[in-house]
Curated annotation (Swiss-Prot):
One GO BP annotation of this record: NAD biosynthetic process via the salvage pathway
The keyword Nucleotide-binding appears for this protein: no
Protein name: Nicotinate phosphoribosyltransferase
UniProt gene name: pncB
Protein family (similarity comment): Belongs to the NAPRTase family.
Species of the source: Acinetobacter baylyi (strain ATCC 33305 / BD413 / ADP1)
Phenotype of gene-disrupted mutants: The nadB-pncB double mutant loses the ability to grow on minimal medium supplemented by 0.1 mm nicotinate, but it can grow normally in the presence of 0.1 mm nicotinamide.
Length: 407
């Protein structure tokens, strides 16, 4: 019995790309075993130790593992042309297993969460766990003053969008913003409040949300394709390490046949990605997603690559999703609007801009089929692995320089 209200009420309360990736895993490599590990990147900025929420977290995880998909939720998923009927049949039977996740305290006294089990189970924990940790943490420091400040900041964002809408020329590519903030949200209710306000006031700017439940409830478009874990898994599957990105992209193409065509570029950095992103993939994929490194430099590299392949960049989409706010998004739109279609996924700044320091938390894939996997980000400090030896080998294979140590 929960001692407080449940945070997750529905298995749809997660990001769309969890479903799109899970479908490929189920169809292409269902026996894959995986390990995920939790990390808070800004422990020194928390108002109290995250370990204080451990008992409540375990209660919430117990509850999460009782949930199943409801009939109307399955019908909603069935309505998307890229979701196959056999996948919905699988989801009808789906239930997260409590034995695959453990939450405790590590040797250094930090909150320690591990997920270990079949990837078709394990990958679905991530967004739920991060949302639960966030909401438990902020529940303890919630006040009317915090909510009032959050509302003030929301109204300022709406006023800024009004200004941008006035400045936008009708013959320019649209300024498109989506909510990518489920994993770092203040609470479910706050995320819904923010999304509803954006959708109501700016339906031509607000493109949708990554959150499938909120997309269903508010009748807006769910947004998402793939995350790092999908590409990383191929580092441990039956392909040469040097070929893992090409294998992942090819598998995606075979599954979706032209749908969900935005490729993520920073699993081993943009330069290494572009070496694999040949004419075949450049024509097949609708565009690219930026999630680390200098966005201007990244977009210019994408532009030069498409030009070299003699592809009209105005037919391609650049999606930016790294630490954005509306001001940064508008500046990027102004810079790239003459060359690309552009869109922006804004996370923490939309769903947890309350005047308190947000948690910078992740639950990342670190092992697949008993073998380490890694991400070598374009941003120092976002690289993640539990195996420095494998990380060094990955750098060598993809000719990536060692990054400066981050304190």
């Amino acid at each position: 019995m929960l001692s407080m209200s449940p945070i997750i009420h529905s298995l749809l309360d997660t990001d769309l790309y969890k479903f799109t990736m899970l479908q490929v895993v189920l169809h292409q490599f269902p026996q894959t075993h995986s390990v995920y590990h939790f990390r808070c990147r800004n422990l020194d900025e928390t108002q109290y130790p995250l370990t204080d929420i451990l008992d409540d977290l375990n209660e919430q995880l117990d509850h999460l593992c009782t949930l199943k998909f409801k009939d109307d939720e399955l019908q909603y998923l069935r309505s998307f042309r890229f979701i196959k009927s056999d996948f919905v049949d699988y989801l009808e039977l789906f239930q997260l297993k409590r034995r695959f996740i453990t939450a405790g305290i590590d040797e250094e006294g930090r909150l320690d969460i591990w997920v270990e089990g079949p990837m078709v189970q394990a990958m679905m924990f991530e967004i739920f766990v991060l949302a639960i940790v966030n909401e438990l943490y902020f529940r303890r420091i919630r006040s009317d003053a915090v909510l009032e400040e959050g509302e003030r900041r929301l109204q300022a964002k709406l006023a800024l969008l009004e200004q941008y809408q006035t400045q936008h020329q009708s013959d320019e590519p649209p300024f498109l913003v989506s909510d990518f903030g489920t994993r770092r949200r203040y609470s479910f209710e706050w995320q819904k409040h923010v999304i509803a306000a954006f959708h109501h006031h700016f339906p031509n700017i607000f493109r949708g949300t990554s959150n499938v439940l909120l997309a269903k409830e508010l009748n807006i478009t769910p947004i998402g394709t793939m995350a790092h874990e999908f590409l990383q898994a191929f580092q441990a599957l039956d392909v040469r390490l040097r070929d893992f990105q090409k294998a992942a992209l090819e598998t995606w193409v075979q599954e979706y046949r032209g749908d969900l065509g935005i490729a993520l570029t920073d699993v081993v950095g943009m330069d290494a990605f572009l070496r694999d992103f040949d004419l075949y993939f450049a024509k097949l994929f609708d565009g690219l997603r930026h999630d680390s490194g200098d966005p201007y430099e990244w977009g210019d590299k994408a532009y030069a690559h498409y030009r070299k392949l003699k592809i009209d960049t105005k037919t391609k989409m650049l999606t930016f999703s790294d630490g954005l706010n509306l001001e940064k998004a508008w500046e990027l739109h102004q810079y790239f609007k003459g060359r690309f279609k552009v869109s922006f996924g804004i996370g923490t700044n939309l769903t947890n801009d309350m005047g308190q320091t947000p948690l910078n938390i992740v639950l990342k894939l670190v092992e697949c089929n008993g073998q380490s996997v890694a991400k070598i980000s374009d941003s120092p400090g976002k690289t993640m692995t539990d195996n420095d030896t494998f990380l060094a080998y990955l750098r060598q294979v993809f000719q990536i320089a060692e990054e400066e140590p981050v304190a």
